[in-house]
Amino acid sequence: MTTVEADAPDYVLQRINHAIFQNVEMLQSNIEAVTGHIRKKLEEKGEADVERKVLHFIPTAEGKTYWYDGENYWRIMTFIPRAKTYETVNPEYSYYAGTAFGNFQAMLADIPDTLGETIPDFHNMEFRLKQLRDAVAADAAGRVQEVRYFLDEIEKRADEMCKAERLFREGKLPKR
């Protein structure tokens, strides 16, 4: 949404897919916790242009960062000027994306363990591997043999892929 005044910010109006994110209140609570934590870290470091580096959601009159119109959930955030998207990624952009993701993870390393699970088992690799193995066994589309090499590679790495879940169960890794 583009504002009329030249010096006023523009906005992004986004419909939240509540078929996927069924607990919209928890989703937004998580986003508020993450963006608030990152904003505080950047401000403490004296970072310039924090508004370009952290999403800012516009609250409703009731103070919520989403609106339900009776059918759909919506949220509005300020548009980040000069932001870009790329259809094709080259190694240089991949490097920058990896660096940004690493910085994001580092800033969240000490976030309190209060985030809710908005999609159950989404990051549970043991669960995802079981889903994959069930799909391979069913071979509903008849294409398993075409991708056997990739499936074998996944199986070779399965134990390592499940390490985080094991460490969490053993109390050696916080759930984040």
Name every feature range the model reports, one short phrase each.
Residues 7-29, 39-115:
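ATP-binding pocket architecture of kinase catalytic cores
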Residues 34-37, 107, 157:
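Generic, well-ordered alpha-helical scaffold segments in large soluble proteins
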Residues 35, 98-99, 126-127:
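Charge-rich, low-complexity amphipathic helices
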Residues 1-5:
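Conserved ATP phosphate-binding architecture of protein kinases
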